[in-house]
Amino acid sequence: MAVWIQAQQLQGDALHQMQALYGQHFPIEVRHYLSQWIEGQAWDSIDLDNPQENIKATQLLEGLVQELQKKAEHQVGEDGFLLKIKLGHYATQLQNTYDRCPMELVRCIRHILYNEQRLVREANNGTSPAGSLADAMSQKHLQINQTFEELRLVTQDTENELKKLQQTQEYFIIQYQESLRIQAQFAQLAQLNPQERLSRETALQQKQLSLEAWLQREAQTLQQYRVELAEKHQKTLQLLRKQQTIILDDELIQWKRRQQLAGNGGPPEGSLDVLQSWCEKLAEIIWQNRQQIRRAEHFCQQLPIPGPVEEMLAEVNATITDIISALVTSTFIIEKQPPQVLKTQTKFAATVRLLVGGKLNVHMNPPQVKATIISEQQAKSLLKNENTRNDYSGEILNNCCVMEYHQATGTLSAHFRNMSLKRIKRSDRRGAESVTEEKFTILFESQFSVGGNELVFQVKTLSLPVVVIVHGSQDNNATATVLWDNAFAEPGRVPFAVPDKVLWPQLCEALNMKFKAEVQSNRGLTKENLVFLAQKLFNSSSSHLEDYNGMSVSWSQFNRENLPGRNYTFWQWFDGVMEVLKKHLKPHWNDGAILGFVNKQQAHDLLINKPDGTFLLRFSDSEIGGITIAWKFDSQERMFWNLMPFTTRDFSIRSLADRLGDLSYLIYVFPDRPKDEVYSKYYTPVPCEPATAKAVDGYVKPQIKQVVPEFVSASADSAGGSATYMDQAPSPAVCPQPHYNMYPQNPDPVLDNDGDFDLDDTIDVARRVEELLGRPMDSQWIPHAQS
């Protein structure tokens, strides 16, 4: 729920605290009318201490003013007139207030949002002990920002300590030079007479003794300062490493996991802006500490004092180098993944990004990134640091790209827009593994120079696994491999190991995610749908979903072994359902007009107590991507009727709505919705033409109509009449008397005597029409066929 909606429900002192956040600096009306826009901006991604971020802050200010002006323009009516003036005034006021200091607007809104979230969280503690996911994320982000503040303070502290050390050491060196000068004066005393020499010698000895005692004490102080500074750096690096682990091993890995699930249709992985701001802060603090450590080393070399400091500094220097190396190599990521089902000779794109490119000035010498395709085994060898140089599994065209720095967004990225896989070299397959189960990956590699070539890093990153196909017919099985990998890959795995078996509830989650994404629908798989799928997969009759919760599904069951009595796998059947829904039936699924996941017997059980003419649509058990109509009509012959399945090919000829509209004896959509109420908005209008209209060029226009001759005959016999199948008029359309071309009645039965259709013995009339139109015609019809 939006924070502002919850904030408006605050009461008592919490409400007063919330109201006190607003004033002339930021009116509460602006928060109210632009609540959605305000909460949708990445305020936390801006580093308030970085002057270069002024551009982003200015863009946010301009966006805020524009949104206010748009909101003002849309106000109408008497009340709207006053609001229009008020919002316009606020737009001008905010522009004038923050035009020269846009960072202050960011600081102000961040303060408001943080306190609103805190007040809402405190108010909800009694009703929501666990807290919402958004609250948990907000709390975690708050902790990260607090740690950054702590790191900033300790880094400033060591900077001050370093300056103190420098001043102390410089004064020590001056006094040490004074000691050397005194020693030189002793050598000159020989030239003086004995009395004067004795007097001067005594004074110089006292001065030298005093100075040497001071130098000895000060040397100990210097050594103590150095040790304390090194110890502080050790603590800073511990905190830095902990913070970096949270950001790289938790937050960034979670983003990558979301990116992987997005490949299965999950929600978008989200912006990288916040992550980049954190990584840039890490880079800045790491680099500051590294420079401090190097200066401390320089001081030790300038004035060597025996002790443990040299060893301590060498250790922290090695540690800070490891930390910055991990940061640079881990933040070289793939922002936009290449397609995971990759067809040869087909253009594809990808984008890689370095999250610390701006802060470490990598963009000053723009690096080039190279993309190559490698096998699963080569990826394993790469992660083991084995020599795999020039060991590739194919050839990619346009596989080199220079990284570009975008000043406005502060991003350093390389956009591969026109890559193409020219050829692929496959490895020997294991056992029953097919080519669509073989996984490859795109390797992106580059070389980054940091700190003016002070440090050079070889960086590599691997794409999500890709399956290479050479023909569209392989897409179905390749998608299954990708789905299984994306859903069940474990963090830190060896490329590209996945479990061979998963629990049924895990697969349900993956299927539902994929289904909603493919069909582009919020109507996902219900509990009843999942029971049906479990029955199909496990060949079981149990109707309780709980009975399947402990059952495992193997990869072989999913997409290697055919379903019992069928010539296709579970995934192939499920993918066919998604395909036909996506291409032709999406609005009907969203309307709830397709029951879909029921078998024939379940359909009959659902219809048995319904009035004649009640029908439902279910996915065919016998044909991939098929959908059939089951309806009730109690005749002498039978009570339930099942029409031969329609497929994508059929709906390319005539839509489902029009086919249902043709069959007037289908009256109610299960359970009791009038058919025309559900489907009439999808009927194709029939143009009205007068009966006397002349044919153009001697031709008359044909029209295709869905008919079921066997049912019409049976229903007519049952009614004792003599109606023919053409007496069954379609549902109301635009034209009251549509004209249909007459085709011979199909002599083959569409329905079996027992109510089951047989694909070998039945044929749909629409397909019959298509066959007739494809046969050789008399010479007078040939020109028309070509026109």
Swiss-Prot record:
GO terms for biological process: cell surface receptor signaling pathway via JAK-STAT; cellular response to epidermal growth factor stimulus; cellular response to growth factor stimulus; cytokine-mediated signaling pathway; defense response; development of secondary female sexual characteristics; development of secondary male sexual characteristics; female pregnancy. Tyrosine phosphorylated in response to signaling via activated KIT, resulting in translocation to the nucleus. Tyrosine phosphorylated in response to signaling via activated FLT3; wild-type FLT3 results in much weaker phosphorylation than constitutively activated mutant FLT3. Alternatively, can be phosphorylated by JAK2. Phosphorylation at Tyr-699 by PTK6 or HCK leads to an increase of its transcriptional activity. GO terms for molecular function: chromatin binding; DNA binding; DNA-binding transcription activator activity, RNA polymerase II-specific; DNA-binding transcription factor activity, RNA polymerase II-specific; protein dimerization activity; protein homodimerization activity; RNA polymerase II cis-regulatory region sequence-specific DNA binding. The modification Phosphotyrosine is found at Y90, Y682, Y699. It comes from the Eukaryota. Keywords: Activator, Cytoplasm, DNA-binding, Nucleus, Phosphoprotein, SH2 domain, Transcription, Transcription regulation. GO terms for cellular component: cytoplasm; cytosol; nucleus; RNA polymerase II transcription regulator complex. It is found in: Cytoplasm; Nucleus. The modification Phosphoserine is found at S128. Residues 589-686 form the SH2 domain. Carries out a dual function: signal transduction and activation of transcription. Mediates cellular responses to the cytokine KITLG/SCF and other growth factors. Binds to the GAS element and activates PRL-induced transcription. Positively regulates hematopoietic/erythroid differentiation. Belongs to the transcription factor STAT family. Upon activation, forms a homodimer or a heterodimer with a related family member. Binds NR3C1. Interacts with NCOA1. Interacts with NMI. Interacts with SOCS7. Interacts (via SH2 domain) with INSR. Interacts with CPEB3; this inhibits STAT5B-mediated transcriptional activation. This is Signal transducer and activator of transcription 5B. It comes from Bos taurus (Bovine). The lineage of its organism: Eukaryota, Metazoa, Chordata, Craniata, Vertebrata.
